[in-house]
């Protein structure tokens, strides 16, 4: 049986359980926090389903809404979920295209965690009769994860869901 985490392992986690969190409406990658992966010898997926993502159209300033799916195979570090929530919330007044938002999120998480593999998929609600679903991924170069990333990219939407107005 594995022991729980000790206080030293949790000292960098400052947002979880804090009642005085500030909800910033402007892009803040510095709010992301990480903790050590205690299972580094094993490949496994961590998946976040984020159904309340909001950003702004950079041209019109109108809000865009999406469900974002973030899946990764951790290496040494993992993202703390409360900090991820606050980070995603910080896109509320950020003006960028859907594709840019997904790549920014992925790049920030790569910088934070240096995962073996990560993918970010945004499923945006329709505007003007069109929904946009950008998918981006990354696998560590010169590893099996790089090959995995290529395979998943080429096959990520073989069975698209039926769109019925989300």
UniProtKB/Swiss-Prot annotation:
Catalyses which reaction(s): 7-aminomethyl-7-carbaguanine + 2 NADP(+) = 7-cyano-7-deazaguanine + 2 NADPH + 3 H(+)
Known pathway: tRNA modification; tRNA-queuosine biosynthesis
Principal EC category: oxidoreductase
Entry's Gene Ontology cellular component terms: cytoplasm
EC number(s) given by UniProt: 1.7.1.13
GO terms of molecular function: preQ1 synthase activity
GO biological processes: queuosine biosynthetic process; tRNA modification
Keyword annotations from UniProtKB, A to Z: Cytoplasm, NADP, Oxidoreductase, Queuosine biosynthesis
Active site: 57, 64
Amino acids binding substrate: 79-81, 98-99
Compartments, record wording: Cytoplasm
UniProt record similarity statement: Belongs to the GTP cyclohydrolase I family. QueF type 1 subfamily.
Physiological role: Catalyzes the NADPH-dependent reduction of 7-cyano-7-deazaguanine (preQ0) to 7-aminomethyl-7-deazaguanine (preQ1).
HAMAP family found in the cross-reference section: QueF_type1
Protein name: NADPH-dependent 7-cyano-7-deazaguanine reductase
Organism: Staphylococcus saprophyticus subsp. saprophyticus (strain ATCC 15305 / DSM 20229 / NCIMB 8711 / NCTC 7292 / S-41)
Name of the encoding gene: queF
